[in-house]
Amino acid sequence: MLLSDRDLRAEITAGRLGIEPFDDALVQPSSVDVRLDCMFRVFNNTRYTHIDPAKQQDELTSLVEPQDGEPFVLHPGEFVLGSTLELITLPDDLAGRLEGKSSLGRLGLLTHSTAGFIDPGFSGHITLELSNVANLPITLWPGMKIGQLCILRLTSPAEHPYGSTRVGSKYQGQRGPTPSRSYQNFITST
């Protein structure tokens, strides 16, 4: 069940749904707008010949932070990682779904490639997979509305929520745009 504005406010007021910093003006009829943080991860295309999800490639991306008052310019065809300004914390019986903003989509900005789902138990900043499919550069301003977070109530609390040892939660507690940790899926224990 998708939570309405009144249910979202009730969960936040009760302290079960964490959104920090919280601005009540960002609550929509069935979502909460989230804003863009000031850090971005850009891909270094001169260090590696290819991306291998099975290998740890620490120098694949670099952290970039525009100067105060300056935007980040996302060029046509470019893909970077960003993150929400808000720290999101979900209880064991709520899940989230990040969607883009229609107004930005109409300009050619994609907010996430595949990872729009947030598991119950997650706590951290949501990493954004930002792509410019327009034929002109798009300026991304820190603090701008970048997406909307929908919250879904589970039929029962998750038995093993995100963050529990059994799940292997690679991104619990992440701060800022966090690079892929897919290589951890290939590690075999002996």
Swiss-Prot record:
Q: Where is the composition biased (Polar residues)?
A: 171-190
Marked site, Important for bifunctional activity, at G116, F117
Q: Per the record's keyword annotation, is Oxidoreductase included, yes or no?
A: no
At which positions is dCTP bound? K101, S102, S103, L104, G105, R106, D119, T127, L128, E129, Q148, Y162, Q174
Could you tell me which InterPro entries the record lists for this protein? dCTP_deaminase, dUTPase-like_sf, dUTPase_trimeric
User: SUPFAM superfamilies, alphabetically?
Assistant: dUTPase-like
Leading EC class: hydrolase
Source organism, top-level taxon: Bacteria
List its EC numbers: 3.5.4.30
Record keywords, A-Z = Hydrolase, Nucleotide metabolism, Nucleotide-binding
Q: Report the GO molecular function annotations.
A: dCTP deaminase (dUMP-forming) activity; dCTP deaminase activity; nucleotide binding
Q: In which pathway does it act?
A: Pyrimidine metabolism; dUMP biosynthesis; dUMP from dCTP: step 1/1
The family classification in the record reads: Belongs to the dCTP deaminase family.
What this chain does, per the record?
Bifunctional enzyme that catalyzes both the deamination of dCTP to dUTP and the hydrolysis of dUTP to dUMP without releasing the toxic dUTP intermediate.
Q: Kindly provide the name given to this protein in its UniProt entry.
A: dCTP deaminase, dUMP-forming
